[in-house]
Design a protein with these regions (language model features):
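Post-HEXXH active-site segment of zinc metalloproteases
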Residues: 84-100
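Conserved small/polar residues in nucleotide/adenosyl-binding loops
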Residues: 105-107
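His/Glu-rich zincin catalytic helix
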Residues: 1-86
């Protein structure tokens, strides 16, 4: 997954963390486009599979993990890293916005 994306900016405040991520040209925007990489992320952060997932098919992230946007995967990884480090506090979900340029993501 080296060279997949660049983190342009990270802003941390008391109640949230925001990241601006640019997916490099030619890299997959959907998890289904690189299922091996998606599986590697799962093996590194297996707890994301059981995350509640609102607005997608199924109830848990595992229900859509193999066919979702890369930004959605990064959102769940971010929430889980915050949980594992104790920085999440009351945060239990994330929000992702894709700009007019599909490769620029705001998590």
């Amino acid at each position: 997954m080296a060279g997949l994306f660049n983190i342009l900016k990270v802003t941390v405040s008391e109640d949230k963390i925001c990241a601006h991520v640019l997916v490099n040209p030619g890299m997959p925007l959907m998890t289904s486009e690189d299922i091996e990489a998606t599986a590697r992320v799962y093996y590194l952060v297996p707890a994301i599979a059981k995350h509640l997932c609102l607005g997608d098919s199924g109830r848990e992230f595992q229900d859509c993990m193999g066919q979702t946007e890369l930004c959605h995967l990064l959102e769940h990884v971010t929430v889980e890293l915050m949980n594992e480090t104790g920085l999440a506090g009351s945060i239990s979900c994330g929000r992702t916005r894709v700009s007019e340029h599909l490769s620029l993501i705001h998590i």
